[in-house]
UniProtKB/Swiss-Prot annotation:
Region listing for Large ATPase domain (RuvB-L), in residue ranges: 1-181
Lineage of producing organism: Bacteria, Pseudomonadati, Thermodesulfobacteriota, Desulfuromonadia, Desulfuromonadales
Compartments where located: Cytoplasm
Gene Ontology CC annotations of this record: cytoplasm; Holliday junction resolvase complex
Reaction equation(s) it catalyzes: ATP + H2O = ADP + phosphate + H(+)
UniProt cross-references to Gene3D superfamilies, sorted A to Z: 1.10.8.60, P-loop containing nucleotide triphosphate hydrolases, Winged helix-like DNA-binding domain superfamily/Winged helix DNA-binding domain
GO biological process: DNA recombination; DNA repair
Entry note about domains: Has 3 domains, the large (RuvB-L) and small ATPase (RuvB-S) domains and the C-terminal head (RuvB-H) domain. The head domain binds DNA, while the ATPase domains jointly bind ATP, ADP or are empty depending on the state of the subunit in the translocation cycle. During a single DNA translocation step the structure of each domain remains the same, but their relative positions change.
Protein name as annotated: Holliday junction branch migration complex subunit RuvB
One Pfam short name: RuvB_N
Amino acids binding DNA: 310, 315
Amino acid sequence: MSRAIAADKREDDSQFDSTLRPKSLDDYIGQEKIKGNLRLFIEAARGRGEALDHVLLYGPPGLGKTTLANIVACEMGVNLKSTSGPVIERPGDLAAILTNLEPHDVLFIDEIHRLSHVVEEILYPAMEDFQLDIIIGQGPSARSIKLDLPRFTLVGATTRAGLLSSPLRDRFGVISRMDFYTHDELATIITRSSRILGMEIEPRGADELSRRSRGTPRIANRLLRRVRDFAQVRADGVITRQVVKETLALLEIDEMGFDHMDRMILLTIIDKFSGGPVGLDTIAAAISEESDTIEDVYEPYMIQNGFLNRTPRGRVATLAAYEHFGRSVPAAPQAALL
């Protein structure tokens, strides 16, 4: 069973997300610094009649990178072509996409960190010189020809900016980090989504749902779907604070937005390893989960909210984690926790 609070994309999210997705920077809620910068750069590019400089958006999943790519295309008044790193397996795949772009079009590559090295080599001159180097023939008779490309904007999105090669990262003129959303921003997003879907939600209901959505709009909108179902069947269609609490209790999501797996990770560190430090591989073995999954999917939210520390010696549960679960802090590590 998939996690209701997983921030990764799912097939059943696509139609729902497209309905709720804002179409302009004015409608986009949150990420104020990024919005302000993009608004300035877009206005300048349009004023000069040029393509926008290449944009790299990085940060945890579900924060709106794809939405911003769509908005960039809309604000520039151009087409958007979308693909992802794993899909572009060969240089020919990328060449086919690039040669079909119109002037000033936006090419969006999700999971850009997963591009192969050989595909990246094709992308470098395309981004920098708007030229495509193609090898014709094989062996001694092989020759290279250059094809001119229309000036386009590449918008790359990644959850793991550290895996991008330096040559690729250096070719982006605009690099922006997406941050988790505040409770107030999420409550506004939830209220907006409810209005679009024709649902009645009370302010306290939106606030309660925002506090359990892990700072992530995708999770907030997904949980809103589940709350809508509950409200429709058991609460006359009105989403109140109590409806939200009862729905999320059924989904085993607590007041911090932790689900069963989050609690298992933290309680394993606290109960089995005296709060840590404990190695990531040891935690993974103890709960039968992949180390990469723990590090990339579960830990960021815990660290962001001060429930977990990464140290050179391993993971350490913080004082906040002990208090959240009503556990007594061991005497020895207490100073480190404080």
